[in-house]
């Protein structure tokens, strides 16, 4: 009965299956945690969604920014970009079933017994766990409702970038979405910076990676996240696990077995595409 945490899959279906075979994942007894961004850029987004959905209660996932963008494309709000390679999914006979399932997935996973929290981009140091749970539920409720296209149309944007319990309406939902799915850097007070994509050693002062600023959640729980492929799983404090290692860019797909903290990797089937260097931070 093992728990396996895997970073951003981004449509890399073959690598996902190979990695699960490598660790001898057994859905009947094991649990798979996925950090989000199941889709886009890799060639197999349709197969990834079909497989993950088929796992039922054996999988715990969170939504990433690319998953939300897919939902916006599906709703007719955003443009289907060829580089995302989503057309086979959008044109599949079971697209409605898959994407209506996807929009009902959470932004946050918490295991109190393991003292483990997972979100796609991480947990802002401005939140305690109760606030994070409440905020996740706010967005999840809208996404699972019939009014979800209205939210998806309004979610794009970098402001507001500072948390306040007084935030309301679409501004509140946009901050929550950015914190859970797009965050990388914060100012020392925890305010989000949504612009810098430099590596931590080159980030302009006074910005720090969100995980370098102490917060109530990181002080009491381990946090697993994806999103930030250029970290390559390195440079985080103890108890913070960066699992996106750029499989869709020619890197690797990374798995952490929680019980003994052993890592497993599956090299990407893609050659490193230097032309997409900026997009590694997307």
Curated annotation (Swiss-Prot):
It holds the Pfam family Metallophos. The keyword Hydrolase applies. It catalyses: P(1),P(4)-bis(5'-adenosyl) tetraphosphate + H2O = 2 ADP + 2 H(+). The keyword Cytoplasm does not apply. InterPro entries: ApaH, Calcineurin-like_PHP_ApaH, Metallo-depent_PP-like. Its EC number is 3.6.1.41. Keywords: Hydrolase. One of its GO terms (molecular function) is bis(5'-nucleosyl)-tetraphosphatase (symmetrical) activity. Gene3D superfamilies: 3.60.21.10. PANTHER family: CYTOCHROME C5 (PTHR40942:SF4), PTHR40942. NCBIfam families: apaH, PRK00166.1. Belongs to the Ap4A hydrolase family. HAMAP family: ApaH (MF_00199). Hydrolyzes diadenosine 5',5'''-P1,P4-tetraphosphate to yield ADP. This is Bis(5'-nucleosyl)-tetraphosphatase, symmetrical. It comes from Salmonella arizonae (strain ATCC BAA-731 / CDC346-86 / RSK2980).
């Amino acid at each position: 009965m093992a728990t396996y945490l895997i970073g951003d899959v981004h449509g890399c279906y073959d690598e996902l299956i190979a990695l699960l075979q490598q660790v001898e994942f057994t859905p009947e007894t094991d649990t798979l945690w996925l950090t989000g961004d199941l889709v886009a850029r890799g060639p197999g987004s349709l197969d990834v969604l079909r497989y993950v959905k088929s796992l039922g209660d054996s999988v715990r996932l969170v939504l990433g920014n690319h998953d939300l963008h897919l939902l916006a494309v599906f709703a007719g709000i955003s443009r289907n970009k060829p580089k995302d390679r989503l057309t086979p999914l959008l044109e599949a006979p079971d697209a409605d079933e898959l994407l209506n399932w996807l929009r009902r997935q959470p932004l946050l996973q918490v295991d109190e017994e393991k003292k483990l929290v997972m979100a796609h981009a991480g947990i802002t140091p401005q939140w305690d766990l109760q606030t994070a749970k409440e905020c996740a539920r706010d967005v999840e409720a809208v996404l699972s409702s019939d009014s979800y296209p209205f939210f998806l149309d309004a979610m794009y944007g970098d402001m507001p970038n500072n948390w306040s319990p007084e935030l309301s309406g679409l501004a509140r939902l946009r901050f929550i979405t950015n914190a859970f799915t797009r965050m990388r850097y914060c100012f020392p007070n925890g305010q989000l910076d949504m612009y810098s994509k430099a590596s931590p050693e080159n980030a302009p002062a006074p910005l720090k990676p969100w995980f370098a600023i102490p917060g109530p959640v990181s002080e009491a729980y381990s946090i697993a996240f994806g999103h930030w492929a250029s970290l390559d799983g390195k440079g985080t404090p103890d108890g913070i696990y960066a699992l996106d290692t750029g499989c869709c860019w020619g890197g690797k797909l990374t798995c952490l077995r929680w019980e003994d903290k052993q890592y497993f990797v599956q090299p990407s089937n893609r050659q490193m595409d230097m032309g997409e260097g900026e997009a590694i931070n997307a």
